[in-house]
Amino acid sequence: MDLINIFSVLIVALFSGVLGSLTGLGGASIMTPILVALGLPLKYSIANAVISIIATSAGSSAAYVRDRITNIRAAMYMEIFTIIGGIVGAYLTLMLPAVVLYFFFASFLILVLFLSREKGSLNDVSRDRKIDRFSRWLNIRGEYYDPGDKIYISYIVRRAHIGGPMMMIAGVAAGSLDIGAGAFKTAIQEGIMGLPPKVATTTSNFIIGMTGLAAASVYISSGYVDPVLAASMTLGTAVGSIIGSKILPIIRGRTVRILSMIITVYLIIQMIYKGVSQLWI
């Protein structure tokens, strides 16, 4: 890559890192379709973007953990499932044709939008009722101060026996598509497990790094990673994610949810268009 292209990738990665950190999608979720639009094959885009996922997670997670928004206990439970799914998904990418991947993650993101509509309000999340036996045994709960809404928010995880296995599907999507898995993780945590929007976003960012690390090992061994491209994306998304982590605590939870849904709709349109284009080639 020449210097102009490297600089362009850095700028786009910086912007993607900010948005990815704010929404929990991960900077690579925004970066991958841009690389495809610039002419890079989908599988190479996914492989190199997976590397930057690790940087996005590391860059933003430190601040979120310090502010006590991220729920580490919930993250450790869900990572059991996402890491397994990430490895499986990476191998699927190497085996499946690109057109199948386009339509697969477009369908996947439509499911994300459906789950987003089922998310409860913050008041519902705060109530310690209708907790199943397994979730009571795990006892995953937390409290944090939201400077955007100017209130303390308490919550407890519900339906962990459903949310955990569904995270394996998110892991497969993260490993095979590298795009939209963050949105799916966030939707599962809010809509099924009952986490507040900001906790779901920050915990998703924390989980994304571990899932990406598992998938990256497969892509690196298969020769799909370009060191210069991956390094440029990693630097940009890492800086962007740090900036995003400074912005998130001061904006309202509703704003985070709306921004996440807008980006998800954009990704659906982009991938359906690419999939249809592949069919006509």
Q: At which residue positions do the language-model features occur?
A:
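Interfacial segments of multi-pass membrane proteins
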Residues: M31-Y44, G175, F184-V199
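Generic transmembrane alpha-helix signature in multi-pass membrane proteins
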Residues: I30-T32, A58-I69, G171-G175, K185-E190, ...
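Short helix-coil transition sites and intra-membrane helix breaks within transmembrane domains
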Residues: V18-A28, A174-A181
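Short hydrophobic/aromatic, small-residue-rich stretches within specific transmembrane helices
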Residues: A49-I53, S204-I208, L229-A230, T234
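Juxtamembrane transmembrane-helix termini in multi-pass membrane transport proteins
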Residues: T23-I80
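Membrane-embedded alpha-helical segments of transport systems
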Residues: I51-G59, F81-V88, L92, I207-A214
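Conserved kink/hinge residues within transmembrane alpha-helices of Major Facilitator Superfamily
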Residues: G20, G24, G59-S60, G86, ...
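Juxtamembrane transmembrane-helix boundary motif
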Residues: M1-S16, V36, L42, R66-G171, ...
